[in-house]
Amino acid sequence: MDKYKKLIGNSFVFAIGNLGSKLVQFILVPLYSYTLTTKEFGQADLLTQLVFLLTPLVSLELFDGVFRFALDELPENKPQLISSVVGVLSVSSIVCLIIGGVTDTIFSNFEPLLTSGFLVANIWFALISNYARATGYVKVFAIAGILNTLIMGLTSFVLLSVFRQGVQGYLIAFIVGLCGAVVYILAATRMYKQISFKYFNSAKLLELVKYSAPLVPNYFAWWLNSSSDRVFILTMIGSAANGIYAMANKIPNFINLIAQIFSQSWQISVVEEIKNDKSDQFITTVFEVFCGVLFLAGILIVTWIRPLFKLLINHNYFLGWKLTFIMVLAVIYGSVSIILETVYTASKETMIVFKTTLYGAILNVLLTVALIPLVGYYGAAIANTISFAVVVLLRLRGIIKRGLLKVNYRKLATYHVVYFLAAALPFLLKNDVVVIAFGLCICIVIMITDKNMLNISRKLILHKELK
């Protein structure tokens, strides 16, 4: 199967899985709003964020290590890989549940035991699903994502609407959904046949830890780079400004969803191709097309943003549309940095990933503190954009030095110029229809003149080999 077709095919499968899950989550919002008080939902959301924050720390990001190593491990060695991690995570899971049980007797209002159960279930789902994805069970991985949210949704309905279990029901639903998805993956892939403590290999485990350990602080640095702006706006300006800022970021996050879906298939493809003599051609082509797609999406968003705010968003947040063009650029840079990160993880150079993320996070905090007093929440958006741009430049420099990527600087500069022209249209023209028409014309011209986009699209349609 041609590498480009495989990349796009996997992306399509992951898109179905991700969008299906997002749809179920969207449908659940009214259920939560009618069955949980604002206090209960606030507590439930806080516990959920805590679980997602603790998952990399408690697991040492070993599920990412399993994914990377399983992609190029010989079939006879894969049982050692998965069994070694299962052994370690079994111990850490037991410790988590014991701690949760003990603290539950003291702080029962915060549901420590159920939160620990949610954390353990989330870790095991991450491990089992990533191993399935790495060993070729892409469709099983996608179905498991949908199944997880479906089971969680049905359980939420029963526990919240029928039995009125509140926060406890909310957490139990997550646990049941994750466990159901894990059971499905184990059954569909027969992975359980590869798991045995007799395959435990301490040397293999140490190799995994060396790879995964830098990804733990990287996760927290990335979180700081992405979320610290909200904290500073809240403390330095106020909750109203933070609300406008948060709302302005909702629509640009659509680009982030595109990047997340694509990165799931890109991780597989880049590991398979990086040892190839012509890997630089593949990485360069994908990088150029991906950047083009991101800027196309960005241009559409900034030219549609004003009418979208008028139609979909409460008038109290209307000023947020003026922030969007900066936030879209930040999301584009953040998405590009994720794709570049994958090239480093494919080469098992995770320490560089951590260092570049850390530099961006430090710069983001310093710029945010300096700019907010000068230009308000625009300063936070500008700081976010600059910090992600620096991360991209640092990662690009390293990848270019390794001969894995050739950057068409003229094309990237053109994308930026065209983007800023499109972003200026809503500020210069009052007629939304005219702005949208200009935006569509710009996108059509880019698609027609971009040779890589045209080549990949034409060959895929004609089912020809891509070169």
Each language-model region and where it sits:
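Interhelical loop/hinge segments that connect adjacent transmembrane helices in multipass membrane
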Residues: 1-3, 139, 167, 171-173, ...
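Transmembrane helical elements of multi-pass membrane transporters/channels
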Residues: 10-25, 148, 173-181, 185-189, ...
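Membrane-water interface segments that mark the loop-to-transmembrane alpha-helix transition
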Residues: 9-21, 46-104, 109-110, 277-297, ...
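Specific pore-lining/lateral-gate transmembrane helices of multi-pass inner-membrane transport
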Residues: 70-87, 244-357
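Alpha-helical transmembrane segments of multi-pass membrane transporters/permeases
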Residues: 11-21, 79-80, 116-122, 132-157, ...
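Membrane-proximal transmembrane or re-entrant/amphipathic helices at the cytosolic face
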Residues: 426-467
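Signature of the first transmembrane helix
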Residues: 3-63, 97, 149-153, 157, ...
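Hydrophobic alpha-helical transmembrane segments
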Residues: 113, 143-191, 359-363, 377-398, ...
